[in-house]
């Protein structure tokens, strides 16, 4: 059985500690992780319900050491992990380092800002920046921006956004 299958299986089953332990064993044997292994290890960090920021930072260090930080899927997953644990500074660093941002990147960054309730204006800013970059909002993006409208009590902006949601066909 390959290390990737072993780590991925444990991550899928929610066996966070075992997945990370196997990852560390793999490294002790001198094996270099690939993209899929790193994705599975990152997902394992969030699999048990509580995301361990120390583990995410450790995995991030491994990603950098193994020169995998330019992989879009890894960057997005790492950004999402930092966002989920409320680590805004690290999320921003990963976001700005991404060479190619897609709708997943933008929504993860919006979730990070929404986790910090006082930063709704940043969600609006990033929404405008995303559209300027030519990225079309999806249901997740609209949800993030609506949440920011609620936090900011931005009723008129919320109404305008609701109209856009209807025009985009996400109202059902």
Model-derived features: positions:
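Pentatricopeptide repeat
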Residues: 3-4, 8, 19, 30, ...
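Core domains of intracellular innate-immunity/apoptotic signalosomes
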Residues: 15, 25-30, 128-134
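Alpha-helical repeat/alpha-solenoid scaffolds of the HEAT/ARM/MIF4G superfamily
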Residues: 45-53, 66, 76
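Residue-level detector of the short coil/turn that links helix A to helix B
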Residues: 14, 51, 86, 117-118, ...
């Amino acid at each position: 059985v390959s290390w990737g299958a072993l780590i991925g299986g444990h991550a899928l089953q929610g066996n966070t500690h075992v997945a990370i332990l196997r990852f560390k064993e793999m490294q002790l044997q001198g094996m270099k992780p690939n993209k899929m292994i790193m994705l599975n290890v990152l997902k394992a960090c969030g699999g048990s319900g509580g995301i361990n920021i120390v583990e995410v930072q450790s995995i991030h260090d491994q990603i950098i050491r193994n020169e995998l930080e330019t992989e879009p899927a890894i960057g997005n997953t790492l950004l999402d992990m930092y966002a989920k644990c409320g680590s805004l500074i690290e999320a921003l660093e990963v976001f700005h380092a991404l060479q190619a941002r897609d709708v997943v990147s933008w929504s993860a960054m919006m979730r990070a800002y929404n986790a910090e309730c006082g930063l709704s204006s940043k969600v609006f800013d990033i929404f405008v920046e995303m559209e300027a970059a030519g990225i079309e909002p999806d249901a997740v993006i609209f949800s993030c921006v609506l949440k920011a409208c609620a936090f900011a009590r931005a009723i008129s902006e919320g109404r305008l956004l609701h109209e856009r949601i209807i025009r985009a066909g996400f109202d059902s």
